[in-house]
Amino acid sequence: NGIQKNIRLEVIKTLKKWNGKLIEVPYTKNSSLLKNQSKAKKTFFTPMSRVSRFRRLLETQKIVRFIECHNPLVGLLAEKLSINLKNEFREFHGLWSSSLTDSASQGKPDNQSVELTTRINNLNNVIEVTNKPILFDADNGGRPEHLPYTIKNLERLGVSAIAIEDKIGLKSNSLFKDQSRANQDTIKNFCRKIKIACNARHSNDFLIVARIESFILGQDLNDALKRAENFSKAGADLILIHSKIDTPKEIFAFAKKFKKSKYYKPLVAVPSTYSSVKEEELISSGFNV
């Protein structure tokens, strides 16, 4: 009944054609689970091995949990926090390097007053004391000409992914009610930015997350879906669909439609304003992160 359920059923179906039978070893509750996890936390990961951890988690977990991290102390808290629920180990799998909290922690507004270079330099301090994969919130990624250098710097440090939003102009935090000064990039221009990011990375294990701001800027579901399909075709590895209303209604409607698309990619939710949503609801609706 886990993440391999459908594969198991397919194997059983195929074996029946040959009068075969699947031999299954009973699941063993891992009594040393916490000890193994503790050992893993003490392991040093090289930048290259750390980059690939997010992709591996996507392939093995029902949902990958990230928590924001704006300094080494927060990173250590996220690194060490864990609970054991009926022999099921729960933890945050990764760290979200947020432009909002990076800016707020330095007493500045979330409008790119803290530039990318400064944020990446500060991120190095977090990387020194943590091992979890990092997803870097890069706002709109900056100028297309500068984006390759951002990608190379992040990958060199061992960051696992970058999230780039389809907004242009002066940054305005997506949770603000007034978005009248915010503008959305054209699909064509943003697809070009995604391709630049994909071409700049050294390894395909470094993931490109396309963040869609259609609901934030008052656009409809069709606009969000059109963007998701085009961004997927351009090379995005994951799609982050953002919303600022206090329920997951918008993102669930999006996921229901996008799951049926031939251009489907894993989905990311950021439940800042709809934090009452249950993890199980996100999973059943098709979200992966």
Give the location of each predicted region:
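Alpha/beta enzyme core
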Residues: F44-S272, S276-F287
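Catalytic machinery of carbohydrate-active enzymes
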Residues: G2-T43
